[in-house]
């Protein structure tokens, strides 16, 4: 899984940059960062990442769940939600998109490593 290509979709720039730094320090290749669903769809098409880390609350008119649903249907790329939302309705709605994982903010590096470091993503695509 190390050296995997990752797209970060996060509306909080500071969180996104911090996440990028931590992922790169762990050996992952962060392709890009975007803060909205439309850009996420375009960057997914252009860069074909191995994994997308997706916030639910995004800038623009499409949220992370709708974006993940479209990515799943069009590209079959695994998505891990990184979000502050942990209510039942949001989790239920997110689960329809068949996410690879769901991490509630605030999170630690080890939370991401547990999901990404098990090697299952290699056989997912």
Model-predicted regions and their roles:
Residues 10:
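Conserved acidic carboxylate
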Residues 66, 73, 86-104, 110, ...:
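Alpha4 helix (beta4-alpha4-beta5 surface) of REC/receiver domains from two-component response regulators
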Residues 20, 33-51:
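Acidic, metal-coordinating helix/loop segments flanking the phosphotransfer/catalytic sites
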Residues 36, 62-66:
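Acidic catalytic/metal-coordinating carboxylates
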Residues 13-32:
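Two-component/phosphorelay signaling modules centered on CheY-like receiver
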Residues 76-86:
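A short, hydrophobic beta-strand element within the central beta-sheet of small alpha/beta folds
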Residues 55-56, 83:
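Active-site residues of response regulator receiver
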Residues 1-5, 110-125:
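Non-catalytic signal-transmission and effector/linker regions of two-component phosphorelay proteins
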């Amino acid at each position: 899984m190390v050296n995997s290509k990752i797209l970060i979709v996060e509306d909080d720039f500071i969180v996104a940059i911090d996440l990028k730094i931590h992922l790169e320090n762990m050996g992952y290749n962060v392709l890009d960062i975007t803060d909205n669903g439309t850009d996420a769809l375009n960057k997914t098409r252009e860069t074909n990442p191995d994994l997308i880390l997706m916030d639910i609350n995004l800038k623009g008119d499409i949220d992370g769940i709708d974006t993940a649903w479209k990515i799943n249907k069009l590209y079959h790329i695994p998505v891990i939600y990184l979000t502050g939302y942990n209510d039942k309705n949001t989790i239920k709605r997110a689960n329809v998109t068949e996410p690879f994982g769901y991490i509630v903010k605030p999170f630690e590096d080890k939370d991401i490593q547990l999901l990404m470091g098990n090697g299952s993503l290699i056989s997912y695509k």
